[in-house]
């Protein structure tokens, strides 16, 4: 049976009933490199996907394709993208493995009890496969397991209540008959021990309690509404201004300038809302981002977020001039940039060759903005949605990062935060998409994707990639071109001839380093700025 995609991320979690004889572990002291080599030896690899998995003095296993390690060189993640041709079976002992996902991969067989050896596993997703048999009790001994997704399989029985097991997110069976105890035989009065009059009394009491509870809630809500109604009338038209622009800004002036948020003045749509051009006067033009009120738990949270960002100022960040917030309307007021966004710039540059110094300037400006958010803001600011449409340009090709104002803020003692996945498909870092754990290295990954788009004629998920296997993106394409000795063909038309080839290749390698799976290998944005400044064109 040919196993698609990431089948062998599952290691020793299960054995296929029709697979070959599994390899055995050589002992408790088996090193990760030896374990990976054993895994490779059990595969049929006609396309040489694992050709870099060779034990020699020039590199260690942490640099092999698809392998990510921690600071102790222990394997913590294995993502084999584009490995549809791998075939075989194997057992691998990786005690530090923390994340394993293989959904919709046509996996069969049973889950082996040796799953209990993965003491560091946090995410285990085996949904929509063809797994059978019973779920081994060893799974419930995995103390660090946070996410378990087994739905869409053919297991016997269902999930039982297990003592001392606390999962942050448990997704188990769909369309199963044995989730929880059956109640088919427990509905008769005889077995319940209750007479009809007793049942009627209980139901009546429950209804009375429910009605009283609703009345109390309505009473409290009504009092709160009356107490705040006058305040709302006074505040509904207020605009908080951070920057003195020489003219008064009122709610009526801004809303009228947007044409009352008419479609003709709409200049962009994003995850937080739509942006409108507001021309108050010929010399005072603003961009007004109208937010979806439901994204915030009331205007108090909104005020808290904005007040924390009031001092976030950098030459390459779009300037926040002011805002309005009430229970029915929220919008931010930014300076308007007439050069459009980077997404449109990339689409339209085919009409004329773009000089290397212009592309370099844009790349450096964005890197500086991100470095400021990550390194100089306290608490640090994570953007979480770096993409070309969130990078604005003026008429001199100066680049400005937008939409940072509503990203999550981290305390100084935190290096990451667990939250729902924000961002745009194609730009989201793989570890963020898989575990919802985001750090500044997720922004670095997104920056690498944007950098590849900036220097090439490809999009993150270019239509031309459809002929390749699932998961093939601009990173896969750039690696493929390099491996075939076609680095020159990565760059947009005319760029190789006008830009110094050595500098262009350095930027290409920077983009690929920003998009590696291993967080420890990805550079910081401060390091990216340092490299870009070193190869800065002499004439700007």
Swiss-Prot record:
Extracellular side: 20-198
Transmembrane segments: 199-219
Subcellular location: Cell membrane
Pfam families in alphabetical order: LRR_1, LRRNT_2, Pkinase
Molecular function GO terms recorded: ATP binding; identical protein binding; protein kinase activity; protein serine kinase activity; protein serine/threonine kinase activity
Catalytic activity: L-seryl-[protein] + ATP = O-phospho-L-seryl-[protein] + ADP + H(+); L-threonyl-[protein] + ATP = O-phospho-L-threonyl-[protein] + ADP + H(+)
Segments forming domain Protein kinase: 261-535
Keywords: Abscisic acid signaling pathway, ATP-binding, Cell membrane, Developmental protein, Kinase, Leucine-rich repeat, Membrane, Nucleotide-binding, Phosphoprotein, Receptor, Repeat, Serine/threonine-protein kinase, Signal, Transferase, Transmembrane, Transmembrane helix
An annotated GO cellular component: peroxisome
Keyword Hydrolase set for record: no
Modified residues (Phosphotyrosine): 334, 372, 427
Residue numbers of Phosphothreonine PTMs: 250, 258, 435
Consequence of gene disruption: Decreased sensitivity to ABA during germination, growth, and stomatal closure. Impaired central domain protoderm patterning defects, and defective cotyledon primordia cell types.
Protein name: Probable LRR receptor-like serine/threonine-protein kinase RPK1
Record SMART domains: S_TKc
PANTHER family: LEUCINE-RICH REPEAT-CONTAINING PROTEIN DDB_G0281931-RELATED (PTHR48006:SF102)
Organism: Arabidopsis thaliana (Mouse-ear cress)
Function comment: Involved in the main abscisic acid-mediated (ABA) signaling pathway and in early ABA perception. Together with RPK2, required for pattern formation along the radial axis (e.g. the apical embryonic domain cell types that generate cotyledon primordia), and the apical-basal axis (e.g. differentiation of the basal pole during early embryogenesis).
């Amino acid at each position: 049976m040919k196993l698609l995609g990431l089948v062998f991320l599952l290691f020793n979690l299960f054995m296929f009933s029709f697979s070959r004889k599994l390899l055995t572990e050589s002992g408790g002291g088996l090193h990760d490199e030896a374990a990976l080599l054993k895994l490779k030896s059990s595969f049929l690899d006609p396309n040489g996907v694992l050709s870099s998995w060779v034990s020699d003095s020039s590199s260690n296993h942490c640099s092999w394709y698809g392998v990510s390690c921690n600071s102790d060189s222990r394997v913590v993640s294995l993502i084999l993208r584009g490995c549809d041709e791998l075939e075989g079976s194997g057992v691998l002992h990786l005690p530090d493995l923390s994340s394993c996902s293989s959904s919709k991969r046509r996996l069969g067989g049973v889950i082996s009890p040796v799953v209990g050896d993965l003491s560091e596993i946090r995410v285990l997703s085996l949904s929509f496969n063809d797994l059978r048999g019973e779920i081994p009790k060893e799974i419930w001994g995995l103390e660090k397991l946070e996410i378990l997704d087994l739905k869409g399989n053919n297991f016997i029985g269902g999930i039982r209540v297990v003592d001392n097991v606390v999962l942050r997110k448990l997704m188990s069976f769909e369309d199963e008959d044995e989730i929880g105890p059956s109640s088919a035989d427990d509905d008769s009065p005889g077995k319940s021990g209750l007479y009809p009059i007793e049942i009627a009394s209980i139901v009546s009491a429950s209804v009375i309690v429910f009605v009283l509870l609703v009345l109390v809630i309505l009473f409290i809500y009504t009092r709160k509404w009356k107490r705040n109604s006058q305040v709302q009338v006074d505040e509904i038209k207020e605009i908080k201004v951070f920057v003195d622009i020489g003219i008064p800004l009122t709610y009526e002036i801004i809303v009228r300038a947007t044409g009352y948020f008419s479609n003709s003045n709409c200049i962009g749509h994003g995850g937080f809302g739509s942006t409108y051009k507001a021309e108050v006067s010929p010399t005072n033009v603003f961009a007004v981002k109208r937010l979806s009120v439901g994204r915030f738990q009331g205007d108090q949270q909104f005020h808290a977020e904005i007040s924390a960002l009031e001092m976030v100022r950098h030459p390459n960040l779009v300037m926040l001039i002011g805002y309005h917030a009430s229970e029915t309307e929220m919008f931010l007021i930014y300076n308007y940039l007439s050069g459009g966004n980077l997404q449109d710039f990339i689409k339209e540059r085919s009409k004329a060759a773009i000089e290397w110094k212009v592309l370099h300037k844009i790349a450096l400006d964005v890197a500086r903005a991100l470095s400021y958010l990550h390194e100089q803001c306290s608490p640090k600011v994570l953007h979480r949605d770096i993409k070309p449409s969130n990078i604005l340009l003026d008429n001199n090709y100066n680049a400005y990062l937008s939409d940072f104002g509503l990203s999550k803020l981290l305390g100084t003692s935190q290096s990451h935060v667990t939250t729902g996945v924000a961002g745009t498909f194609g730009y989201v870092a793989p570890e963020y998409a898989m575990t919802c754990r985001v750090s500044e290295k997720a922004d670095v990954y997104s920056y690498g994707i944007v950098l590849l788009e900036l220097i090439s004629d490809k999009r993150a998920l270019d239509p031309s990639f459809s002929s390749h296997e699932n998961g093939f993106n601009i990173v896969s394409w750039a690696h493929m071109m390099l491996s075939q000795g076609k680095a020159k063909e990565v760059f947009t038309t005319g760029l190789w001839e006008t830009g110094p080839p050595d500098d262009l290749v350095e930027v290409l390698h920077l983009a690929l380093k920003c998009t590696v799976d291993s967080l420890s290998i990805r550079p910081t944005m401060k390091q990216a700025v340092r490299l870009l400044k070193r190869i800065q064109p002499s004439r700007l």
